[in-house]
């Protein structure tokens, strides 16, 4: 029978006393002393971890994305420019997406605000509490992964139309120290 102590032990989280003395599959020995077959059975009993689930989902998505071209879905226009010279666009202009760019039905007008992360968060909070009708949605603070951590952060603001974006810029003062970068972004 296992002994239980009533002595206080400093801990960062809650402690739970367990009266069950049987070993579960996750308490099995690990490492070189555990055979391959036993390890396989233990892992099967526990199920796939988050990383394995992510890999399985990625493989399934790749299998589903095999391109198929029929006469009705073939692209009819090519964009100009060195980066997009091989990118095609679908001619289907019947998209139900309300966020439209004249040349791409799946794009929305945006502003990328660039600046100090804390200032961006405060500005976004002020927008949510007073200017909600002047934009559609705002992102959380984000950064480019290839830049050093001490660089500026971004908040992206989406609009339903170029007119709404212009109205936003006419009525909202962008704080000093923030840069507003206008553009279009695919809607996801």
Swiss-Prot record:
Query: Where are its TM segments located?
Result: none
InterPro entries reported in the protein's UniProt record: E2/EBNA1_C_sf (IPR035975), Nucleotide-bd_a/b_plait_sf (IPR012677), Papillomavirus_E2_C (IPR000427)
Protein's UniProt keywords contain Ribosomal protein: no
Compositionally biased region (Low complexity): 51-65
Which one GO biological process term can you cite for this protein? regulation of DNA replication
Domain of life according to the entry = Viruses
Q: Where does this one sit in the cell?
A: Host nucleus
A GO MF term: DNA-binding transcription factor activity
Stored Gene3D superfamilies: 3.30.70.330
Keyword terms: Host nucleus
Q: What is its main location?
A: host cell
Q: Name one GO cellular component term.
A: host cell nucleus
Where is the segment annotated Disordered? 1-105
Composition bias of kind Polar residues appears in 18-27, 66-76
Q: What does the UniProt function comment say about this protein?
A: Plays a role in limiting the replication of viral DNA in keratinocytes. Recruits the host NCoR/SMRT complex to viral replication foci to mediate repression of both viral replication and transcription.
Q: Which family does it belong to?
A: Belongs to the papillomaviridae E8^E2C protein family.
Output this protein's name.
Protein E8^E2C
Q: Which organism is it from?
A: Human papillomavirus 29
């Amino acid at each position: 029978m296992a002994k239980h102590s009533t002595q206080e032990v400093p801990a960062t989280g809650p402690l739970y006393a367990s009266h069950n003395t049987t070993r579960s599959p996750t308490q099995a020995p690990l490492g070189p002393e555990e055979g391959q077959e036993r390890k396989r059975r233990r892992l099967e009993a526990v199920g796939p971890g988050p990383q394995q689930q992510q890999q399985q989902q990625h493989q399934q998505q790749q299998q589903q994305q095999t391109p198929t071209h029929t006469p009705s879905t073939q692209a009819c226009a090519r964009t100009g420019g060195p980066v997009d010279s091989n990118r095609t666009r679908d001619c289907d202009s019947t998209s139900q997406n309300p966020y439209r760019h004249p040349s791409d039905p799946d794009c929305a007008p945006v502003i990328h605000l660039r600046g100090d992360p804390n200032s961006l968060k405060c500005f976004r909070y002020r927008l949510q509490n007073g200017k909600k009708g002047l934009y559609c949605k705002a992102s959380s603070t984000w950064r480019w992964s290839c830049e050093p951590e001490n660089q500026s952060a971004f908040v992206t603001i989406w609009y339903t139309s170029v007119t709404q974006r212009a109205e936003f810029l006419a009525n909202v003062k962008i704080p000093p120290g923030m840069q507003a970068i206008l553009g279009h972004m695919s809607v996801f």
